[in-house]
UniProtKB/Swiss-Prot annotation:
One of its GO terms (molecular function) is glutaminyl-tRNA synthase (glutamine-hydrolyzing) activity. The lineage of its organism: Eukaryota, Fungi, Dikarya, Ascomycota, Saccharomycotina. This is Glutamyl-tRNA(Gln) amidotransferase subunit A, mitochondrial. Its EC number is 6.3.5.7. Present with 486 molecules/cell in log phase SD medium.
Amino acid sequence: MPLKRSLKESIERLSSFQSKYNIFTSINPSPYSITNKKGTKETLTGCVASIKDNIVTKDFPTTCASHILENFKSPFDATVVKLLKQAGVHILGKTNLDEFGMGSGGVHSIRGPVINPLYPHEDKKIMGGSSSGAAASVACDLVDFALGTDTGGSVRLPACYGSVLGFKPSYGRLSRFGVIAYSQSLDTVGILSKKINVLRKVFHTLDKYDMKDPTSLSVELRELIEGNKKVRRPLKVGIVKEFSHESMPIGFHRLYLSLLEKLINLGLEIYPVSIPSVKNCLPIYYTLSPAEAASNLSRYDGIRYGYRDSELDIKDGILFAPTRSKFGTEVKNRIILGNYNLCSDAFKNNFIKAEKLRVNLIDEFDGIFRFPNVLTNSKGNPDGLDLLIVPTSSKLPGSIRDFEEEEAKSPANSYINDVFTVPMSLAGLPSLSMPLKEKTPIGLQVVGQYGDDSTVLDFVESIS
C-alpha cells in the first residue's frame, strides 16, 4: 500500500483525488487488497500500481479514452501486466490519457482532462500527456508506480509536470504485446514512480524477451549488451548545444546550474556536444508517427470490435465512416495527416526522406557515445560520452483553458512540447526524466546509448 497508509485512509484519499483530478478510467472494486504472497528482494510483492488505459487487461475495460473502444474488454492481459501480477503487484486501476496516446496535454479524453495535482485545483493546470493519469496517480501517492506508454515523450513530459520520475527504456526492452498501437516503431512501455529503487525493480521485472512481440529485443542482443558493460570512470556527460535553454521556465537555470555543480563535485566530466540532426526531429516525428497511426487505426471498422452504430440502416459502403466518426478531433487530425504522408507524392517527398533523416540522427548519436549500439553494429566512440542531460520541457504547465485555446488556433502549437523528448524516441534511446526540485514541474532528462539503460538508472540513483 503506498506510503503504508491504513486501508480506510487510502480508499478515502483515492475517492477524493479521483473526484478532483480525474485520474482513472476504471478502478479495482477492491482497491488496496494486497496479496498475501511472500516477496523477495527482486519482486514487487505488496506494491500497488496503475496501468495506462491503452495497455490491455482482462480484469478492467481498455478504452484508450475513446468512444470507439468505450466498452471493450480484452480477453487477455498484456505481457507487462502479466509479469507484474506474477511478481505480486496489486493493480489499482486504469489511468486516463489522451485518446489513443495522441496528445501532450492530457486533455483529449472522453473522460475529460486530467488536472495537475501540484497546483490548487481551481487553477486547473494541464498534467501533460499522454500518460497524464499515470503521472497523476504517482504524484498523488495513490500508487507505488505506474505503467504508461511513451511514443514521443508521453511518459517523460507528464512525469516532469507532476514532479516524479518517468523512464522510457530502450525501444524493444519491454514487451509491447497487449499495448494498443499508436506508432509501432516508436511506442515504448514506460515506468513512473517517485522512488528510483522502485522504478529500477519494475524495470528488471519487465525487462524480458517476449516471443509474442516481434519488436522485442532478442536474447542474443540482450546478452551482447550485458557483455559490453564495463566500468567507465569518470563518467562523461554531454550537454547538447542545439537545445537552446534561452526560453526555459523561470527557475530552470538556477536548478540546472546547481545540478551541474553537483556533478562536477562528484568527479564527473561535462562536455558540450553537437547533434545537428536534432533540429529535424519534430518534422521527422510528425511525418512518421501519424502515418503509422493511420495504418494502425484502420482496424477500427466497427465489425470485429469497438463501436458500431446499431441504428444504421446498413447499406453497402456506409458502415465504415459512421463508425470512425467516434474518433476524437486530435485522432482524426493525425489520421488525415498520416494518410496524406502515405499518399504517392508525399510518400516520396516526405515519408522516405523522414526515414533517411531518422537514420542520420541515430548515426550521430552512435558517434558521440562510448557504449556500442548493438542494433547498428556501432563499435562505440572510445573518447565519447556516457550520458546526455537534456531539459524535459521548455514550458511550465499552463491552464487547460489556455492549452485548448492555443490548440484550437493550430494543433501544431501543442506539438512544440515534444521538442526535447522526440529525438530520444526516434533513436530508441533510454531516457529518464527526473525533477530538479521536489514538487516543482521542472525536469531534466538523463539519456544513454541504446541498450545502456543500467547506466541511466545508476546515474539517477547516485544523485538522488
